[in-house]
Amino acid sequence: MLYALICTDKPGSLAARKANRPRHLAYLKSLGETLVLAGPFTESDGQTMNGSLIVVEAASIDAARKIATNDPFARLGIFASVDIRPWLWTMNNPGKEA
């Protein structure tokens, strides 16, 4: 099943996010095919990152939670919150027709 990890940064954490982004990206890359898609949320300027959307394939919500908990941004306290929700990829899914 797919799970969307909707991660919101703590206010004032942009410097820590930028400094630790290589670790975060390396962690996401290490997930291999478990990672479906990922990218940062931004402020209205389209540049200033303030959170992340990460979609993973996991056997259960507990497995998705473990992935979220092990993210360096979570371990370093950059995320204020992580909402984990089951997700159905309906449109533009390269693996299935709608």
Per-range role (PLM):
Residues M1-A98:
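Conserved, structured core segments of small domains
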